[in-house]
């Protein structure tokens, strides 16, 4: 499980330090800050969302997100669960971008959930780039 609260990764509740057998994970903001060429190249690619206003808004304001890579031929047995939590006041909006790369003949189950208190207004604009 990967947990993000208020836009910040919470390492204390994550499964595994950097992934598991056949897969690895990192954080989008960290990869961009380091200038990771494969991440920056994917940001510049045209995608099916060209002209999509919600995707454009996500691109303009995107914050952190997960970067998950599954090795060629790997079969990840346990689901990877990304939990995005909102809490506290005032009302908020979040814009995240996650990149998932799945190698040839590899498989995984990816679950995303978005949670927050019933009495808090929050808006989520998330984009998942799967390749």
Q: Where are the predicted features?
A:
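Glycine-rich and polybasic anion-binding loops at the starts of cofactor/ligand-binding domains
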Residues: 1-131
